[in-house]
Amino acid sequence: MGKKIVILGGGESGIGTAILAKKNGYDVFLSDKGKIKDKYKEVLKHIEIEWEDEKHTESKIFDADVVMKSPGIPDKAPMIVKLKEKGISVVSEIEFASWFSEVPVIGITGSNGKTTVTNLVQHLLKEGGINSGMGGNIGNSYAKMVAEEMHDWFVLELSSFQLDGIEKFKPHIAILTNITPDHLDRYDYKLENYIASKFRIAENQTEEDYFIYDADDKNITDWLEKNPVRSQKLPFSIEKKIENGAYIENENIVVTINNTKFTMPTSELALQGKHNAKNAMAASMVSQLLRIRKQTIRESMASFQGVEHRLEKVLKINNVLYINDSKATNVNATFYALESMESETVWILGGVDKGNVYDDLLPLVNEKVKAIICLGVDNEKIVSAFGNIVDTMVETTSMSEAVQMAYRLSDKGDNVLLSPACASFDLFENYEDRGRQFKEAVRNL
């Protein structure tokens, strides 16, 4: 393995890789075509790493033995294409970090639910007295944790972009929450390319490892039939009985792994809704595998607080509940949000469309949505999808304008739901920025 690493991208992944590479004696150069945030520049200066931003100096980059590409950079980017033509190894931060850690990993991926499951697994492990570190696609990068923290387990949320650049990395326990069309712009608009990317989480697993997945998801089950995994399969379902895995019977979650049984009433789960029952099943299987006490699992499931920007109740004003679901960046996530609404809803949506098809939402929108507020630069697809079934549709260009409009259109007992079904990069930095702006606008009403 060469000792000269070039890191492309100066965000969380890039900085974590720089710290870890430096610690392991690499000659490190970091290059970002955009602007590096000041807080990251401080870290680079502190650990004495050479860097550049707002440009790529090719002579320095092509001198690398290995290149770490941040997940935001597509494989088709001209720089990546050139590197591969020159035979220079290009890996992801997840792959690079795994070279320097023997600590077992619980890896969680999926189109939706992965952040909730990651947080829930971490909550269960902590309550169960297990020393685990959580990161990956949320919080600290895997590389930074490997460099700076000592744990017995890592709990990692993994995006398809992070999985695209792996070679040998494997989690001991892999969870695939579901697969619905998402990020298709990065996968030649082919769903099978995106599914293949998600399944990379299991491709290096052996018979000693575990693969937890949603048996109700046709995209997953069809793929598994044609592309079997080597690991031990633990499915979960809310539709059918599962012998070795998890299912629901008489309003109870039932988990059976190697003849050990765990049950819990769904009514006691802190997070309600069908999708959260699935999240709970996935996380409770991990707890069973790690032999956490059953009583601890039950108590932890009941006390879990949920995730910011995911169906987060913000405030009630004039008996109207404002709900922040900014993390819903695709249609499937928004489907779950609308499904869980129990009263008339003013729905704020829009942003960067990732090849969305809105057909699945039509029955729910017809039943529950009284007004739609578009928040995005281009709302044409939304207007044509829902214009015939929702009487009131308004286009806005800022969060404060959208929230004020929602305030005007809502009546006592209604919900105002921000669940955009789109990415956030047209008007906001990211979905967190979008969610924070929503909460601020609600508090300013």
Swiss-Prot record:
Annotated Pfam families: Mur_ligase_C, Mur_ligase_M, MurD-like_N, MurD_N
UniProt name for this protein: UDP-N-acetylmuramoylalanine--D-glutamate ligase
Gene Ontology CC, one term: cytoplasm
Family: Belongs to the MurCDEF family.
Domain of life: Bacteria
InterPro entries cross-referenced by the UniProt entry: Mur-like_cat_sf, Mur_ligase_C, Mur_ligase_C_dom_sf, Mur_ligase_cen, MurD
One GO MF term: ATP binding
Location within or outside the cell: Cytoplasm
GO BP field: cell division; cell wall organization; peptidoglycan biosynthetic process; regulation of cell shape
Record EC number: 6.3.2.9
NCBIfam families: murD
Keyword Cell wall biogenesis/degradation: yes
Major localization listed first in the record, in broad terms: cytoplasm
Keywords: ATP-binding, Cell cycle, Cell division, Cell shape, Cell wall biogenesis/degradation, Cytoplasm, Ligase, Nucleotide-binding, Peptidoglycan synthesis
Pathway(s) it belongs to: Cell wall biogenesis; peptidoglycan biosynthesis
Reactions the enzyme catalyzes: UDP-N-acetyl-alpha-D-muramoyl-L-alanine + D-glutamate + ATP = UDP-N-acetyl-alpha-D-muramoyl-L-alanyl-D-glutamate + ADP + phosphate + H(+)
Binding-site residues, ATP: G110, S111, N112, G113, K114, T115, T116
Role played: Cell wall formation. Catalyzes the addition of glutamate to the nucleotide precursor UDP-N-acetylmuramoyl-L-alanine (UMA).
